[in-house]
Amino acid sequence: MELVLCFVIITISGVIRESSALLLRSPTSNDVFGELVASAERAQPLATRLTKRISRLNFNDREDDFWEDHGDASWNNSYTLVNGRTTLGSENRRRPASHSLIERPYYRDGRLSPVLGVQERRGRSVHSYHEEPVSFFDQRAFDEYTFRRRSQLHRQRARAGLRSRIKQNVRRLWTSARGAVRGWGRRVRRKIGDLFVGHLMPQLRRLRFWDQGLPPVVPPLIGNEPGQASVALVAERMEARLREKTLTEKNPTEAQQAVGTYLINSAENTWFISIPGGRYILLKKRGFLGGGGFGLVYHVEHPTTGQPFALKIFVQRVMNNEVGDKISDLIEDEFGVMKYFPPEWTPARMYSELRFMVPLLKLRVLGKPEFQDARNHLRIFSVCALFPKAQGDLEEAAALLADMDRTNAYNMRMSSTIQMVKLLARFHAFGLVHGDVKLQNFLVDKSGLLLLSDFTQILRTNERRYPPVVTVLYMSPEIATCLITRLRNAIPYTAEIDSWMLGISLYRLWCGDFPFGITLDATALQVAGIVIRSSASSLDFASCHDIPEQFREMIVGFLRKTPGVRLSPQQALEQFSLLNWKGPSPASDTASESEPVSTEEAALLQKE
């Protein structure tokens, strides 16, 4: 029952609402709304919507009349003239004077238009008037509008097609250009990156006030040896002679001139970078120390601290534009010595404790290529080896003994002999063979201690090598036999080969010349023939200066032709007590007998 009652109420409300709407829409002869609706119905297919103008102000507060749209669903909308007191529909009302509800046909805002709308006007005064209805539609204006509209659409389509083609072409060109620019940009960025990383960044890093290119710290040599004060005196004379040579040397060799021109110049500081590690080091060349077949050694130091170093530069003589691999292998051998020692032995520790002169760092001259060809037959490498600086080698020191008094000369030879034997025995304890023992490879420190150097030819004990490599004047009988008989079998390298070379070195230190009548200008075949024909018993010590009898026997043991009976450095330390010499007096040892060393003394020598 309640549902039926609700339905009846809703139905009655709808009927009342529709009746009110019909009253508002009923046209009369004098009704402005009726004429408006009639005109709008005739022009409905071409008419535009009337703008809905609704004021949200309070009607009771308004003084002027305005029009309210009751809907915009179609042109059959109902309109009501509203004033401040009442709202009326379908009645004769007064409208503003001189303001037409309908715009004039044909023109709107200065342009011809077939469809005219309705605009609302407000005036200050109102009065009753009658206006004939005006048609919304004009055929001529409509035809002109249709033609203009079609032409406009055609032009718009043409312009749209042209714009589309232009956009496609521009997009295609832009894609091609962008790809080219990206490729070019990548190459440019790569070049700029290489330039920045390789050249600008090192310069910027060097500009840092805390980075002064300091070289590594060289630890002092550990230990003392008897008679090293006399050796230090000779080292001081060697340093003075080196300074004099640096000041008076006016005619450098061709290789030295090429190094000064293409690699490092003494007139300016040179930046180096360590390999590996990338540590920047600033050094200044001070003078030339010496050179060999593939290297030149220079005295360098840090310009601020003055710490001295020895810099070895590798130079290869190239003949007929042919480049061999020997120099490259030699460079690798120079820095490959550390692989033969346990990892706990660093270069600084080996220098300080073992007294082995190994390169502290592998350097490369900053801003220089890997190598440079100078004067068509010299190849200069930018890779260098940095060593602690010594005063010179033992051959230079032996040449200065003639100008010294007998006591200091004797003490210097005694101390040098003991240190040479100990150094080589210490090296053999690692199971290695030096392969190039000679006076030039024993360096003299300013403290009077000797150091063993040049480890480019080292091998493990009993390791074979063919062809053998040796300094000609220090050739052992095994290598001489291989050279004379032209054997093509690899020769096993043992400690006995080093013992022969040590015997040659000691004989030259004490006697000033080579044994068996070998001369400095002898060829390899001549030396090989002399070594094979000679025997240790034929050694002549008549020209030797105050050599002790024990050292004569020791040199004879080192120069035995048969390797099996040849004396080794470790055996010499155990057999000859004079190697444990303590006093610096030349008269303290003139005995001819040779006393064996006791067990306690041998243990002490091994510890030393």
Swiss-Prot record:
Protein kinase. Virulence factor. Promotes migration of Toxoplasma-infected macrophages through collagen matrix, facilitating parasite transport through tissues and systemic dissemination. Plays a role in the translocation of dense granule effectors, such as GRA16 and GRA24, across the parasitophorous vacuole membrane in Toxoplasma-infected host cells. Phosphorylates mouse IRGB6 (TGTP1/TGTP2), an immunity-related GTPase (IRG) that protects mice from infection by certain intracellular pathogens; the phosphorylation leads to the disassembly of IRGB6 polymers into monomers and dimers. Keywords: ATP-binding, Cytoplasmic vesicle, Glycoprotein, Kinase, Membrane, Nucleotide-binding, Secreted, Serine/threonine-protein kinase, Signal, Transferase, Virulence. Immunization with ROP17-based DNA vaccines triggers both humoral and cellular but Th1-dominated immune responses in mice; induces effective protection against acute infection with Toxoplasma gondii. InterPro entries: CDPK_Ser/Thr_kinases (IPR050205), Kinase-like_dom_Apicomplexa (IPR027916), Kinase-like_dom_sf (IPR011009), Prot_kinase_dom (IPR000719), Protein_kinase_ATP_BS (IPR017441), Ser/Thr_kinase_AS (IPR008271). GO terms for molecular function: ATP binding; protein serine/threonine kinase activity. Disruption phenotype: Gene knockout results in reduced virulence in mice due to greater immunological control in the host. Significantly reduced virulence in double knockout with ROP18. Modest increase in the loading of host immunity-related GTPases (IRGs) following infection. Reduced migration of Toxoplasma-infected monocytes and macrophages through the collagen matrix. Reduced dissemination of parasites in mice. PANTHER family: SERINE/THREONINE-PROTEIN KINASE (PTHR24349). It holds the Pfam family Kinase-like. Belongs to the protein kinase superfamily. Ser/Thr protein kinase family. SMART domains: S_TKc. This is Serine/threonine-protein kinase ROP17. Its EC number is 2.7.11.1. Residues 283-579 form the Protein kinase domain. Interacts with ROP5; interaction with ROP5 does not affect kinase activity. Interacts with human BCL2; the interaction probably promotes BCL2 phosphorylation and degradation. The active site is at residue 436. Residues 1-21 form the signal peptide. It is an enzyme of class 2 (transferase). Glycans are attached at residue 76. ATP binds at residues 289-297, 312. It catalyses: L-threonyl-[protein] + ATP = O-phospho-L-threonyl-[protein] + ADP + H(+); L-seryl-[protein] + ATP = O-phospho-L-seryl-[protein] + ADP + H(+). It is found in: Secreted; Cytoplasmic vesicle, Secretory vesicle, Rhoptry; Parasitophorous vacuole membrane.
